[in-house]
């Protein structure tokens, strides 16, 4: 089996395993599957769970797409690949829980290959996971980062620190001067040694459930009211802003003629904006700002 097919098989299995775990945790709703094809090449399967007991919306998509010319978002930092044919596969998910005390989360793992005249001229892995709480708890954030650190350990002492820092820098809303959440891991252009880099991608993909599901279980029965729900919807607006303004995956998908419904499944089903909103000083809502700056969560 060639390298691309090995990655593809891993990713489809990862999607299946995460869907099964989410359905078990939710206990009510199930994923609906939407199979699709892309005119220029490839296709995918998008799965959406809606109106569950725990998750308002959980979307997880697998795609395997190809094209004859790299879109600007992919070739801007690799001008030598302009005009190359390409193929990319990946799994991307975003989960929006009902309960404002359960953080929103995102995970993506992907593999990209560029060819010219039938020869592979570049191939690399990318991905990561990050956490976006609205009412954060130190123990949740520390657990999240402990899992991230542990899965990075076999890949070198500097791996966690470097990819945590990359995550903090990437998921930053410059126009708001705040991070999207409390970070996690982010990496791209990992393509020096296939077996080593593929093993890391699998560690990240497999580690996601270990990082997230204990937080879901811990917070899913926390009581909340209209105040918390309104703040959750307001903060979801930041998620929308980041994904539509900065996110490279969203831009790549739209610029490459991808399926808009699948690309935009990351957006929350309900969201609101409020002009000039300022949380009451000393409130739980105001406390969130202390978490939206890069910091060492593991001491």
UniProtKB/Swiss-Prot annotation:
The record marks 175 as: Important for dimerization. It comes from the Bacteria. Pfam families: Coprogen_oxidas (PF01218). GO terms for molecular function: coproporphyrinogen oxidase activity; metal ion binding; protein homodimerization activity. Its EC number is 1.3.3.3. It catalyses: coproporphyrinogen III + O2 + 2 H(+) = protoporphyrinogen IX + 2 CO2 + 2 H2O. Pathway: Porphyrin-containing compound metabolism; protoporphyrin-IX biosynthesis; protoporphyrinogen-IX from coproporphyrinogen-III (O2 route): step 1/1. Residues 239-274 are annotated as: Important for dimerization. Its cofactor is a divalent metal cation. GO terms for cellular component: cytoplasm. Substrate binds at residues 92, 108-110, 257-259. It is an enzyme of class 1 (oxidoreductase). A divalent metal cation binds at residues 96, 106, 145, 175. Belongs to the aerobic coproporphyrinogen-III oxidase family. Involved in the heme biosynthesis. Catalyzes the aerobic oxidative decarboxylation of propionate groups of rings A and B of coproporphyrinogen-III to yield the vinyl groups in protoporphyrinogen-IX. This is Oxygen-dependent coproporphyrinogen-III oxidase. The lineage of its organism: Bacteria, Pseudomonadati, Pseudomonadota, Gammaproteobacteria, Lysobacterales. The gene is hemF.
């Amino acid at each position: 089996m060639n390298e691309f097919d090995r990655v593809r098989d891993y990713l489809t299995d990862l999607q299946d395993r995460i869907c099964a775990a989410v359905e078990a945790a939710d206990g009510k709703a199930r994923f609906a599957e939407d199979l699709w094809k892309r005119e220029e090449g490839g296709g995918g399967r998008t799965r959406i769970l809606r109106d569950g007991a725990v998750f308002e919306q959980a979307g997880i998509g697998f795609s395997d797409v190809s094209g004859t010319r790299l879109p600007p978002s992919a070739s801007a930092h690799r001008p030598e690949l302009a005009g190359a044919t390409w193929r990319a596969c990946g799994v991307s998910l975003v989960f929006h829980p009902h309960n404002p005390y359960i953080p929103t989360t995102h995970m993506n793992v992907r593999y990209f290959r560029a060819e010219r005249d039938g020869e592979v001229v570049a191939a690399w892995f990318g991905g990561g996971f990050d956490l976006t709480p609205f009412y954060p708890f130190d123990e949740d954030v520390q657990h999240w980062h402990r899992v991230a650190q542990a899965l990075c350990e076999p890949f070198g002492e500097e791996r966690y620190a470097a990819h945590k820092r990359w995550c903090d820098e990437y998921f930053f809303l410059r126009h708001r001067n705040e991070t999207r959440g409390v970070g996690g891991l982010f990496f791209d252009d990992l393509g020096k040694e296939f077996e080593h880099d593929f093993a890391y991608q699998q560690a990240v993909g497999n580690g996601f459930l270990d990082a997230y599901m204990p937080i879901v279980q811990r917070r899913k029965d926390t009581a909340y009211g209209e105040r918390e729900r309104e703040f959750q919807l307001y903060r979801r607006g930041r998620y929308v802003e980041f994904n539509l303004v900065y996110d490279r995956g969203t831009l790549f998908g739209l610029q490459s003629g991808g399926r808009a419904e699948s690309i935009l499944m990351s957006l929350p089903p309900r969201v609101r904006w409020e002009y000039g909103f300022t949380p009451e000083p000393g409130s739980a809502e105001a406390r969130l700002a202390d978490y939206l700056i890069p910091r060492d969560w593991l001491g």
